[in-house]
Amino acid sequence: MMDGESPLRHPRISHVSNSGSDFGSSSDYNKYLVQIPPTPDNNPGPASLSIVLLEIDSNQESVPSVSGDIVSGSSGKDNEPDLTDVRINVGEEEEDDTLLSKISYSLTRVVKISPIIIALYRILIVVRVVSLALFLFWRIRNPNNKALWLWLLSVICELWFAFSWLLDQIPKLFPVNHATDIEALKATFETPNPDNPTGKSDLPGIDVFVSTADAEKEPPLVTANTILSILSVDYPVEKLSVYISDDGGSLVTFEAIAEAASFAKIWVPFCRKHKIEPRNPESYFGLKRDPYKDKVRHDFVRERRYVKRAYDEFKVRVNALPHSIRRRSDAFNSKEEIKALEKWKHWKVKVEEDQIKEPRPALVAPKATWMSDGTHWPGTWAVSGPHHSRGDHASVIQVLLDPPGDEPVEGKGGEGRALDLEGVDIRLPMLVYVSREKRPGYDHNKKAGAMNALVRASAIMSNGPFILNLDCDHYVYNSRAFRDGICFMMDHDGDRVSYVQFPQRFEGIDPSDRYANKNTVFFDINLRALDGIQGPMYVGTGCLFRRTALYGFNPPDVFVVEEEPSGSYCFPLIKKRSPATVASEPEYYTDEEDRFDIGLIRKQFGSSSMLVNSVKVAEFEGRPLATVHSSRLGRPPGSLTGSRKPLDFATVNEAVNVISCWYEDKTEWGFNVGWIYGSVTEDVVTGFRMHEKGWRSFYCVTEPDAFRGSAPINLTDRLHQVLRWATGSVEIFFSRNNAIFAGPKLKLLQRIAYLNVGIYPFTSIFILTYCFLPPLSLFSGHFVVETLTGSFLIYLLIITLSLCGLAVLEVKWSGISLEEWWRNEQFWLIGGTSAHLVAVLQGILKVIAGVEISFTLTSKSSTGGDDEDDEFADLYLFKWTALMIPPLTIIILNIVAILFAVCRTVFSANPQWSNLLGGTFFASWVLLHMYPFAKGLMGRGGKTPTVVYVWSGLIAICLSLLYITIKNSEIDGGSFMLV
């Protein structure tokens, strides 16, 4: 670096050896280079790229040294490769019978639910619809003339509840279960055959995205364990690439992932050798079952103890990173301050003696965060500085583990080694750390923007045709889950599958699941039912995407090829195709001309030629094999057994270019390409856009669970989580992503399901009103009906019994427990009177006044702490929030109303027992649903926080004053009361 130049203009690329032959326990990683964008002022243009190789640990394996400068110019047209340079040509040999050998395979199947259960389920739905219609008609025809206001409020609420129930229930008419055949997948893609004599894997590549944004709320140890579980999955190593998106640009996360890359050289071969499950070390070593069960190898006990000791040391290093980085930075900053002071003294002497004028040097050095090599961390500093804050920092790309070779690399064996890895493949998948550039004045679009940056960077570096995204706290629990997802993509008609959604499963939740954190009703009933229509919604994590679907292209049509068509069947720009009336032989693209409108593609994807050229390659590699059962175009067997192109500095430099903050300007990213912007629930909108184009999705339930994660189990965090989801739904309702405006390719029942997503928060208005009706009824002495007639009771009985019957049948075909169903019902009312109501208000404010809504990141749980012995200590953590005021008011009001009504009826000369019975039952129904909320207010061991007593007292005083005012008005002949 030349003197006087800004350090921001010299990017560096990270690099760590992926050899894995030695297993050092040092916390230092071998070598790394950090790459920063060449445009610190956000002005895209040519810049020089300085490559610096840093020697960190001489005991680790050496990496070939690369030094020098790479000059990366702007992507002008003169230097752009033509799109035809990456055209996939099968060649003249495609007519050969060997290449066109047709394979008949089925990788998935439908597991039918009992026809009797489904028939009864649909009959009960019809019965309940009819009974609701008759009941509402009867209610309208029989008003309560003594309390019309009470009758009118109740009827309006009941009409909305019936409408809301229909929106939720109708999409559940066609539930299905899908199963995969992993053995058939292996036989088709990884078994020697005439087209693949060596039996090398013909499976497509997968790019795995792991996202994190705050090292304080998302502990680096949790993220590191997630990375380790991904690196050790049962999928071809050379076909797997892992990207960690650190949107906070934290050095703690950076070094934690580097530590994980080093520990992976021990952990991954150990898992492969002994078939460890789960492959998250924290979860595996924390299992309460016998770890030696079914382990027959004589060396397992010894090697497990060695790996456990190595993991404990790894945990200590990772947990100590914040302190060690702070201590290191303080030491370097002290040296810099001494240098600055000496420079200032030298300047002062020079000015006094020579009487010359020179710029005064800075007396105080910046409080920088330092890397272990003695350079400034280019991301966010602990003490924010210019170009080093959370919203203003450079890009960083670090290749922690190199792309592996195609041939297995066996470890070393023999006595005296801690791990005998003879015959074990010790290769590791490629691992890349990415932190996109952020600058003031640019909208970074939160998680959606970070995901789109990963999509572009991964397209250039590995270009896997499929993308799996995981939150940092969701780890791989089933090492074969990736194969389960690929079964759907590679099956017949798999080319129309946009994504495969896995259910979210959670750990660390209290056995009773007090606040319905498992959300099993949504994951095992709603999403499973949508699987029988057009597919489940995308829920933000645990989802395997087809890259071309994420790019915004339409699904392929069924057609036959005419006149040497070119390009890809996925893209609407292809000409000369006609519908196929009968199933025809699969054909391959072999033309010599390209009919892509490059200008349009470039407008959508940006100026990067590498990115544009990668689109066709990803589409081709993501096709299922050509089979006799498919009328669509497939890829030839054995076409993905070749070697992957190694990474070079020019490629990584281009990856840095596409994650710059200015790259998305005047492109379709976030609007029609990638994750969609404009909502805090970008996941639902992104999946909706795919379904709107006609894509299909599948729901993949595996045994054991594919992924597991953590969920907030205390009441406050749970309410804030639900608030975020509900706010996103309100945003969807008031946007163009409302299902009402969707195109004709979205099926009717799927449209209703998406419409319900946008409407359900508005039910909170009617829930809140309905919860206040019992105390109003008890205080006034009237009920929602004038008298409890037989017709009313019969209708009520039929509606209640039909609901219970539907619940039992849903439990039968979904596999959830009745307790989980009931917990969901309880939290539906708790959330409806708190978070959903606030979400509606926030959404309306955003639409009318343009008030932006911001949310804090939900804290992820970590190991250790003051209550280390109590697994559910967080459950009793009480943090007051204004969201608790409406439910607390409802509880107090209903309890007071019951006591008041009982006393009044008992001491009344003309007691109205029917009204008391109806009102008390009504209020008890509300209180029964509020029980988990009330229990949460009690804290641990029934110790109610003081703030609850304060608010209860205030509410009681307000109610007393209101009652006195009403009584005085009634005595004076006023008309204050509505009764």
Swiss-Prot record:
<comment type="function">
    <text>Thought to be a Golgi-localized beta-glycan synthase that polymerize the backbones of noncellulosic polysaccharides (hemicelluloses) of plant cell wall.</text>
</comment>
<dbReference type="GO" id="GO:0071555">
    <property type="term" value="P:cell wall organization"/>
</dbReference>
<dbReference type="GO" id="GO:0000139">
    <property type="term" value="C:Golgi membrane"/>
</dbReference>
<feature type="compositionally biased region" description="Low complexity">
    <location>
        <begin position="14"/>
        <end position="24"/>
    </location>
</feature>
<keyword id="KW-0808">Transferase</keyword>
<feature type="region of interest" description="Disordered">
    <location>
        <begin position="1"/>
        <end position="24"/>
    </location>
</feature>
<dbReference type="GO" id="GO:0016760">
    <property type="term" value="F:cellulose synthase (UDP-forming) activity"/>
</dbReference>
<keyword id="KW-0328">Glycosyltransferase</keyword>
<feature type="transmembrane region" description="Helical">
    <location>
        <begin position="147"/>
        <end position="167"/>
    </location>
</feature>
<dbReference type="GO" id="GO:0030244">
    <property type="term" value="P:cellulose biosynthetic process"/>
</dbReference>
<feature type="transmembrane region" description="Helical">
    <location>
        <begin position="116"/>
        <end position="136"/>
    </location>
</feature>
<keyword id="KW-0472">Membrane</keyword>
<keyword id="KW-0961">Cell wall biogenesis/degradation</keyword>
<protein>
    <recommendedName>
        <fullName>Putative cellulose synthase-like protein D6</fullName>
        <ecNumber>2.4.1.-</ecNumber>
    </recommendedName>
</protein>
<keyword id="KW-0812">Transmembrane</keyword>
<keyword id="KW-0333">Golgi apparatus</keyword>
<feature type="active site">
    <location>
        <position position="247"/>
    </location>
</feature>
<comment type="similarity">
    <text>Belongs to the glycosyltransferase 2 family. Plant cellulose synthase-like D subfamily.</text>
</comment>
<feature type="active site">
    <location>
        <position position="683"/>
    </location>
</feature>
<dbReference type="InterPro" id="IPR029044">
    <property type="entry name" value="Nucleotide-diphossugar_trans"/>
</dbReference>
<feature type="transmembrane region" description="Helical">
    <location>
        <begin position="837"/>
        <end position="857"/>
    </location>
</feature>
<feature type="transmembrane region" description="Helical">
    <location>
        <begin position="788"/>
        <end position="808"/>
    </location>
</feature>
<feature type="transmembrane region" description="Helical">
    <location>
        <begin position="765"/>
        <end position="785"/>
    </location>
</feature>
<dbReference type="Pfam" id="PF03552">
    <property type="entry name" value="Cellulose_synt"/>
</dbReference>
<keyword id="KW-1133">Transmembrane helix</keyword>
<feature type="transmembrane region" description="Helical">
    <location>
        <begin position="913"/>
        <end position="933"/>
    </location>
</feature>
<feature type="transmembrane region" description="Helical">
    <location>
        <begin position="946"/>
        <end position="966"/>
    </location>
</feature>
<feature type="transmembrane region" description="Helical">
    <location>
        <begin position="882"/>
        <end position="902"/>
    </location>
</feature>
<dbReference type="InterPro" id="IPR005150">
    <property type="entry name" value="Cellulose_synth"/>
</dbReference>
